Amino acid sequence: MVRVMATGVFDIIHLGHIHYLRESKKLGDELVVVVARDSTARKNGKVPIFDENSRLKLVSELKPVDRAILGHEDDMMKTVVEVMPDIITLGYDQKFDEADLKRKLDQIGVNSRIVRISKYDGNLNSSSMVRKKIMELIGERF
């Protein structure tokens, strides 16, 4: 069985998220999705609208997802060791240096393949674009 791990904040679910998860699922038999903790999202400059437990519930209900878990606050590698994925997928816009990630995986003895998932070709394919569109629509009404 090939286990795939996808990660993200997953705030305001949109078609870009669905594309990322569908493409990730195609790579294996089981898709485990790691939802970022609120504190982790904030450390990376994101302020989630939905709290971590709500985002976890939303993600767990998506069709491609076999299992959704919350990530560790202090060390992503702890989550990797718990999941032991054969493949780790990264979204097109996730700020991971793939070579650095591979080095960290090697250091902890995890031999996961890293796959960067392509960008979804469509409108509103990122949370920031959705937020921007909402603000534009609100601005038009006032």
From Swiss-Prot:
Its cofactor is a divalent metal cation. CDD domains: cytidylyltransferase (cd02170). One of its GO terms (molecular function) is FMN adenylyltransferase activity. Pfam families: CTP_transf_like. Pathway: Cofactor biosynthesis; FAD biosynthesis; FAD from FMN: step 1/1. It is an enzyme of class 2 (transferase). Gene3D superfamilies: HUPs (3.40.50.620). It catalyses: FMN + ATP + H(+) = FAD + diphosphate. Disulfide bonds: none annotated. GO terms for biological process: FAD biosynthetic process; FMN metabolic process. Keywords: ATP-binding, FAD, Flavoprotein, FMN, Nucleotide-binding, Nucleotidyltransferase, Transferase. InterPro entries: Archaeal_FAD_synthase, Cyt_trans-like, FAD_synth_RibL, Rossmann-like_a/b/a_fold. Its EC number is 2.7.7.2. Transmembrane segments: none annotated. It comes from the Archaea. SUPFAM superfamilies: Nucleotidylyl transferase (SSF52374). ATP binds at V9, F10, H14, L15, G16, H17, D93, Y120. Homodimer. Belongs to the archaeal FAD synthase family. Catalyzes the transfer of the AMP portion of ATP to flavin mononucleotide (FMN) to produce flavin adenine dinucleotide (FAD) coenzyme. HAMAP family: FAD_synth_arch (MF_02115). This is FAD synthase. It comes from Thermoplasma acidophilum (strain ATCC 25905 / DSM 1728 / JCM 9062 / NBRC 15155 / AMRC-C165). The gene is ribL.
